[in-house]
Amino acid sequence: MDLCYVLHADHGMNASTFSSRVTIATLSDVYSAITTAIGTLKGPLHGGANEGVIKMLKEIGSLDKVDAWVADALAQKKKIMGIGHRVYKTLDPRAPHLKRMAQVLSAQLGEPKWIQMSDRIAEIMLREKHLNANVDFYSATVYYSLGIPKIGRAHV
């Protein structure tokens, strides 16, 4: 888990860092800044993207359905969660570390399904769209394998 914390925290000026800095700049307290950062991190296009990845993998269901699912998603111009990055136009340098963690956890748990599906999706997206998996793509399998529950969404 320490590696996950470092990979997510030591990442420059992302959305959650920016939002917390804006809060602090108003001379608010540190608790408000942390709350702001967590609220931003929860968004599905920032830290919450890994929830979208697991949801996608569960929807696909099995390795033999990946190719057809991705082809259909691309034909419908759907966003493939965890693929591509606004800053990293090549490989997200954090992704290989989380990929290795996902592989190790999958092997230890005897549950290779999620990492196999993820690897296949990443391979297809690199070939078809020249987009790499990002940090959220593999952290989804890591966190799911560790039994970390998803963040609940408020119903308004």
Regions found by a protein language model. Name each.
Residues 1-153:
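Non-transmembrane, aqueous-exposed alpha-helical and coiled segments at domain scale
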